[in-house]
Amino acid sequence: MSVCDHQRRWVTLAACLMLWLSGVAFAAKPVRHDVLIDMFIWWNAAYKEKDGFTEAAFGKYFTPDAVLRVNGSDRSKGLADLASHFRDIQARTEMVEIELPFIDEFTSASGDRIFTHHFVKAREKGQASRERVMGYAAIRDGKISMINFVSVPDAAAK
C-alpha cells in the first residue's frame, strides 16, 4: 500500500469520525427545562390524578400570590384559587393536555419572563378541541408569579 493510499484511508476515516461525532453531539443535545416546562410536565400528570391539584402541589411551582390571566381576564389569584380553578376544569372535562415540547419558547434577557407558544388539547362532553396559546410566565424567586396567556381556538383543528 502506498503512502497516498494510507493518507486517503486516514482522511476517509477522519471524515467518518467527524460525521459520527457531529451526530452524537446533535443527538446528545440536552432537553431544556425551566420552571414553566417543569410545571406543565407536572400539570399533565396531576390532571390524571383524582387529588392531583392541591394548594401544596401548586406551591412547588407558583408564588403564594400568583395570578393566572387568560385573554385579559384574571382566572385565579393565589395557590388555593389556582387549585380550585383547575379542579373545576378537571371535573368537567374528560381530557386536557398541554402539548410538549412547546412550538417555541424563550426567556427574556433579564430572566424574569418565559415566553411560550404552544397548544392545549381537550375533550369536554365528548367534544374535542385544541387551543393555540401564546404569552409569558413572570418568574420571581424561581417560581411563577403570573401567567399571562392569550388563547384562541386552533383553526387547523376544525
Name these PLM-found stretches.
Residues 4, 13-64, 158:
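Short, low-complexity N-terminal intrinsically disordered segments enriched in polar/charged residues
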Residues 65, 117-123:
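Generic short beta-strand segments
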Residues 72, 118-120, 151:
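A mature extracytoplasmic/lumenal domain signature
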Residues 68-70, 116, 146-147:
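Short hydrophobic/aromatic-rich beta-strand segments that constitute the beta-sheet cores
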Residues 130-158:
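Short beta-strand edge/turn micro-motifs at domain boundaries
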Residues 1-7:
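N-terminal secretory signal peptides that target proteins for export/translocation
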Residues 86, 100-106, 119-121, 132-138:
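Hydrophobic/aromatic beta-strand elements that line small-molecule binding cavities or substrate pockets
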Residues 33, 55-107, 112, 127:
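A solvent-exposed, acidic/Ser-Thr-rich amphipathic alpha-helical stretch
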